[in-house]
Curated annotation (Swiss-Prot):
Residues 64-142 are annotated as: Domain II. It holds the Pfam family RuvA_N. HAMAP family: DNA_HJ_migration_RuvA. Residues 143-145 are annotated as: Flexible linker. Has three domains with a flexible linker between the domains II and III and assumes an 'L' shape. Domain III is highly mobile and contacts RuvB. This is Holliday junction branch migration complex subunit RuvA. Homotetramer. Forms an RuvA(8)-RuvB(12)-Holliday junction (HJ) complex. HJ DNA is sandwiched between 2 RuvA tetramers; dsDNA enters through RuvA and exits via RuvB. An RuvB hexamer assembles on each DNA strand where it exits the tetramer. Each RuvB hexamer is contacted by two RuvA subunits (via domain III) on 2 adjacent RuvB subunits; this complex drives branch migration. In the full resolvosome a probable DNA-RuvA(4)-RuvB(12)-RuvC(2) complex forms which resolves the HJ.
Length: 205
């Protein structure tokens, strides 16, 4: 079992990153917020979970242990596989996800692509009361080292305007790459990236 990787980011796209460890490149699927804060050459530590199915062997990665724990917890719900669990963590950070379960907020959970209202209600029914909030809350830092608080600010700004976290994080990553804006973002770049990301999202409607 591969439980953790420490190495350098070789490349990153909208759904996964290649992390080079000792000359071997591992393809790791990760939540959107983690991917948005990563860049080639960056040294990072990623907590991982290996999923083996009939069709593929997939390595999932997370910037925090809390995020990994939530990923595993979600899969205890019947009918919830790793793809939907990752979709949930790309829509809501682990602390907000745990709070939504605790509060019975099916509407917040149902925003995750591939889930739906019935699936959200099932998660609440099966997990409510079983998640230790003290281990989750306040633990939404991404895999970035140092943390890319600038990118997080942009993503939060886009979410306040009604965009899903997954779409917002992808837009931030894309506009930074397309416009050669270095990450972690400097404070002075935040307004520009927010404007570019918003334009990109509006164009894609």
């Amino acid at each position: 079992m591969i439980g953790m990787l420490r190495g350098h980011v070789e490349s990153v796209d909208a759904v996964s990153a290649i992390i080079e460890v000792g000359g071997v490149g591992y393809e790791v699927r990760m939540p959107s917020a983690d991917l948005a804060s990563m860049h080639a050459g960056q040294e990072i530590k990623v907590y991982t979970s290996l999923n083996v199915s009939q069709d593929a062997i997939t390595l999932f990665g997370f910037g925090t242990l809390a995020s990994k724990r939530m990923f595993l917890q979600l899969q205890k719900v019947s009918g919830i596989g790793p793809k939907v669990a990752l979709s949930l963590l790309s829509t809501l950070p682990p602390d907000r996800l745990a709070r939504a379960v605790a509060d019975g907020d099916a509407t917040a959970l149902a925003k995750a692509p591939g889930l739906g209202k019935k699936g959200a209600q099932k998660i609440i029914l099966e997990l409510k009361g079983s998640i230790d909030l003290s281990q989750i809350e306040g633990s939404s830092a991404t895999a970035s080292t140092p943390e890319d608080t600038g990118a997080e600010q942009v993503v939060e700004g886009l979410m306040s305007l009604g965009w899903h976290q997954q779409d917002a994080a992808h837009a931030v990553q894309t506009v930074c790459a397309d416009n050669q804006i270095e990450t972690p973002l400097n404070a002075k770049d935040v307004p520009r990236v927010l404007k570019l990301a918003l334009t990109s999202l509006d164009r894609g409607r």
